[in-house]
Amino acid sequence: MQPSFRIVADGTDVTQQLNDRLLKLTLLDKPGMESDSLTLKIDDRDGQVALPRRGAVLEVHLGYAGEPLMRMGRFTVDTLQWAGPPDCLTVTAKAGDMRGSGKTIRSGGWEGTTLAQVCRDVGARNGWRVECPLQVAIARVDQVNESDYHFVTRLARQYDCTAKLAEGMLMVLPRQSGQSATGRRIEPLVLGRADVGSFDVTYDDRSLMRTVKTRYQLPGSGEVKSVELKNPKAPATATGEHVDRHLYASRGEAEQAAKARLASFSRSSASVRLELPGRGDLFAERSLLLQGFKAGIDGEFLIDSVEHTYSSSGWTTVVQCNGGRVGKG
């Protein structure tokens, strides 16, 4: 099959202008505020390539000739590099416009609220639409001399969520939920050995913890209490104990933080790298089910990142996975 692409810039299809000039297209998809990116390397051999407007919006589609192309996302141009010889223009764009007010350093606090409400408040002052289905109660949370990007990322990590800004929407979603931002069920994608060009699977017991401890302070008395969460999936050889130094405002927040930290350790228990012919149905936070590889390897993993590369050599996709919430003990 012949790979194909389409690029629309500020509403104008520029595919024909780029057909014989596009040297390389790279798309990176990761869970996180500043991760999703597009890089275009364009041949400017005759000096006729005009510099795109910084802030221009690029919409990218990938697929194969004779089939409907898949929309891969919309990106805002924020970096231009022209180098030579041979003359070449490199355009970098982000799924979230990272040039806006989200990087402003702020301080503030919330009491007696929910994670969803905090996200809505942050979104409102930056002009972002917000999707956060979690009504987790928050006794108190403070933003101290940090940007909204950093603050939301920190909150998401504490509650075992991902935070992503894309196309003007802030999405804060539970990790490995199996659902899209709209609540649509996303089934694990099954990959067999024949689907993959190359693979690399690593199990690492050093990241497994038997116990995670967090602390919280009782209102009024100020007495400090602790929460201990054991890992039921930890092998007998895992004896490590992680103690979170942060002091939480309530028992509920301390318990949630312990669960999130334990899930993070579990995800680090395995890493998988797969290289395969280009396909657009692979994306960060989708569960992947490996079948027909090897006993002890087959099973479910969670996609950490996806990198698509399109060039004259074809379209390839590289997938990085982790061990998921349960881990690979």
Where are the regions a protein language model picked out?
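Short, compositionally biased
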Residues: 74-83, 108, 176-179, 301-312
